[in-house]
Amino acid sequence: MDSFKVVLEGPAPWGFRLQGGKDFNVPLSISRLTPGGKAAQAGVAVGDWVLSIDGENAGSLTHIEAQNKIRACGERLSLGLSRAQPVQSKPQKASAPAADPPRYTFAPSVSLNKTARPFGAPPPADSAPQQNGQPLRPLVPDASKQRLMENTEDWRPRPGTGQSRSFRILAHLTGTEFMQDPDEEHLKKSSQVPRTEAPAPASSTPQEPWPGPTAPSPTSRPPWAVDPAFAERYAPDKTSTVLTRHSQPATPTPLQSRTSIVQAAAGGVPGGGSNNGKTPVCHQCHKVIRGRYLVALGHAYHPEEFVCSQCGKVLEEGGFFEEKGAIFCPPCYDVRYAPSCAKCKKKITGEIMHALKMTWHVHCFTCAACKTPIRNRAFYMEEGVPYCERDYEKMFGTKCHGCDFKIDAGDRFLEALGFSWHDTCFVCAICQINLEGKTFYSKKDRPLCKSHAFSHV
């Protein structure tokens, strides 16, 4: 591992992205670089571990704390980085082997560990193992690229039941990493690169057959690889696997009961029912209900005991009214509580008209002239009788003698010469001067001022 320090001159952006942190139990590292950015120009590489940020140890920082620390560095960012040395294979001297190298054959159901672990006999004591023939090239020549492939594993699309890398790290910390996802194992097997071993040179020396690899310890292999009956024991049709499925009721509620104001209960009742193991009790007779029942006003009833308080009619179907704790059918409610008409003194059971602080039948509150129901239109009262607007203007409307237009309510007017005038219409017929409150003369029912009293009109 090579440790070095990089100083980036601000301002942001710095041209790199972090991953990991104390909260992920993974050291902080560079996961992405912007091509041509400040970090790339300073020699930072993908996969470099971040040891310090602005002089502070990065090992104790969470991912968010590290981001905030970098944002706080305005004009100058100092990073302490560590880079792994690339793994290079060194060619070894070719020598005739004493025996053929062991060939490993893995059954399709055997799970491989994520990190390569030797099976069988331990490696020789020499730290540099001898190779025969052409040296094998490593699958990932750079350790930083290997870390990048592992760190970006969570970004690839995964099946719905696959485990993420963060979950596997947690499993490693809790000691449950051997429980590997079957879907993930299948994907790993399909993506493995087949490795071809160099053929060993023929040897004239007779060799004994290789006994095979030593079976690994049970703790390093998943249970479905060790136990051949694992798949059968945990099949979905076994009792150990519970499938929860939402089930619809066998018989739907009848449409007639749905549209009724009083509905037949399909589930439980307030305060008790099939949902909590209680039996419904009739609110009228206080007896346990066996069979069909009704729910109304928060209580359960026998269908034959939900009746009108006045006439005793069963209210199983149709509407009802509740007044002062008593239940009434619509006819009884209208007779008992419906208002009376101010004209005919009968109960109003249908459409009602409110006018003059009284209630009326619609057909009783009509115009005194045309006998048309007034309903929501404007009306005028004359001698205690209502008139529609059209008939009132025709019969009682006042017109100005000067302009021949109607004098509306609220208009200023005066009466002179036996006629009604708008205050602005009572003017001299010749000079048009206003004569309100002044002496005037009259000729041919037209007012004249003093100056034109003897003029011809």
Curated annotation (Swiss-Prot):
The modification Asymmetric dimethylarginine is found at residue 103. It holds the Pfam family PDZ. Changing residue 63 to A: Loss of binding to TPM2. GO terms for cellular component: actin cytoskeleton; adherens junction; cytosol; filamentous actin; focal adhesion; nucleoplasm; ruffle; stress fiber. Residues 208-221 have a biased composition (Pro residues). SUPFAM superfamilies: Glucocorticoid receptor-like (DNA-binding domain), PDZ domain-like. Residues 1-85 form the PDZ domain. It comes from the Eukaryota. Signal peptide: none annotated. The modification Phosphoserine is found at residues 78, 111, 247. Residues 82-142, 176-226, 239-258 are annotated as: Disordered. GO terms for biological process: actin cytoskeleton organization; cell differentiation; heart development; muscle structure development; ossification; receptor-mediated endocytosis. Isoform 1 and isoform 2 are expressed ubiquitously, however, isoform 2 predominates in skeletal muscle, isoform 1 is more abundant in lung, spleen, leukocytes and fetal liver. Its main location: cytoplasm. It is found in: Cytoplasm; Cytoplasm, Cytoskeleton. Residues 280-338, 339-398, 399-457 form the LIM zinc-binding domain. Keywords: Cytoplasm, Cytoskeleton, Developmental protein, Differentiation, LIM domain, Metal-binding, Methylation, Osteogenesis, Phosphoprotein, Repeat, Zinc. GO terms for molecular function: actin binding; metal ion binding; muscle alpha-actinin binding. Changing residue 450 to N: In a breast cancer sample; somatic mutation. InterPro entries: PDZ, PDZ-LIM_domain, PDZ_sf, Znf_LIM. May function as a scaffold on which the coordinated assembly of proteins can occur. May play a role as an adapter that, via its PDZ domain, localizes LIM-binding proteins to actin filaments of both skeletal muscle and nonmuscle tissues. Involved in both of the two fundamental mechanisms of bone formation, direct bone formation (e.g. embryonic flat bones mandible and cranium), and endochondral bone formation (e.g. embryonic long bone development). Plays a role during fracture repair. Involved in BMP6 signaling pathway. Binds via its LIM zinc-binding 3 domain (LIM 3) to endocytic codes of INSR, but not with those of IGF1R, LDLR, TFRC, or EGFR. Interacts with various PKC isoforms through the LIM zinc-binding domains. Binds to RET in a phosphorylation-independent manner via its LIM zinc-binding domain 2 (LIM 2). Probably part of a complex with SHC and the RET dimer. Interacts with TPM2. Interacts with TBX4 and TBX5. The LIM zinc-binding 2 (LIM 2) domain interacts with TBX4. The LIM zinc-binding 3 (LIM 3) domain provides the structural basis for recognition of tyrosine-containing tight turn structures. This domain is necessary and sufficient for interaction with TBX5. This is PDZ and LIM domain protein 7. It comes from Homo sapiens.
